[in-house]
Amino acid sequence: MTISIYSHTFQSVPQADYVSLLKLRYKVFSQRLQWELKTNRGMETDEYDVPEAHYLYAKEEQGHLVGCWRILPTTSRYMLKDTFSELLGVQQAPKAKEIYELSRFAVDKDHSAQLGGVSNVTLQMFQSLYHHAQQYHINAYVTVTSASVEKLIKRMGIPCERLGDKKVHLLGSTRSVALHIPMNEAYRASVNA
């Protein structure tokens, strides 16, 4: 399957792609993971889908949207700082123009082939993060993610470090962690970017 990666701001993302992105998030987070989120007509959106947001997403050759990230600057409101700050403990929330937050990572398992335990869509989505970082002078990403995604990141050899008290926290029914992911040569090599 041939995958194309797209990069758009909240203002520039084509409406049809944005709707597909919200539907993928609904499928992954509401249906598959059973998270209790605000949804509307089979789409998931939240208070962080704002003008400052940037979206990276993958489409297969028939135009089906199969993966996405949301990226927010840490110089404004973002999920780790403003919703899940308990993951930071006494640590100050990152706030720097070269650090961005990753959220709403989703891959459509129905349209992604596995290559050595990691789907081609997942690998390309992680490669796109490196290219995005290079383009926008991003030194690192922070993210609130599940312990299972952290395990995937480590299995891929991606450098990362837990933030805050470095413990797993239960957010709803999801075992979650806060991570710092540097955009460095080790990251580039781990994803073959």
From Swiss-Prot:
One of the protein's GO biological processes: lactone biosynthetic process
Catalytic activity field: a fatty acyl-[ACP] + S-adenosyl-L-methionine = an N-acyl-L-homoserine lactone + S-methyl-5'-thioadenosine + holo-[ACP] + H(+)
Top-rank EC class of the record's enzyme: transferase
EC number(s) from the headed UniProt entry: 2.3.1.184
UniProt xrefs under Pfam families: Autoind_synth
UniProt keyword terms in alphabetical order: Autoinducer synthesis, Quorum sensing, S-adenosyl-L-methionine, Transferase
Transmembrane segments: none
GO function terms (MF aspect): N-acyl homoserine lactone synthase activity
Family matches, as PROSITE patterns: AUTOINDUCER_SYNTH_1, AUTOINDUCER_SYNTH_2
Functional description taken from the UniProt entry: Required for the synthesis of N-(3-oxodecanoyl)-L-homoserine lactone (ODHL), an autoinducer molecule which binds to VanR.
UniProt family annotation: Belongs to the autoinducer synthase family.
Protein name: Acyl-homoserine-lactone synthase
Species: Vibrio anguillarum
Lineage: Bacteria, Pseudomonadati, Pseudomonadota, Gammaproteobacteria, Vibrionales
